[in-house]
Amino acid sequence: MDSKIKAYLTELYQSYHADDQKQADRLNRWRSIEPESAELLSVLISATQAKNLLEIGTSGGYSTLWLAEAAQQYGGHLTTLEIEADRIATATSHLKAVKLNEICDTLCIDAADFLK
């Protein structure tokens, strides 16, 4: 993984984790996966050289960045779904910051509607 992206992910996780600690209501939290889980997903994507990925529940884009970075290694593409527009905007800004937005479609849609 590119060192700039890795540093960005580390900082983002720390920021989200600190923010989550302040939120009493679980629904107000970012609900990011743990770095070890994200790294495992990245390894699995790389091992299978997956080309088309679907993420349901973008939240703030932490796992999205991991998935997109892994997908780009093999010319893959990620579609990520989130029902909350503000979270899609946040995730999109993170994707742009690390130049992964070109391989990722961020859709503001209920996953149930998308999967019909």
Positions of predicted regions on the chain:
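A short alpha-helical cap/connector motif
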Residues: 1-116
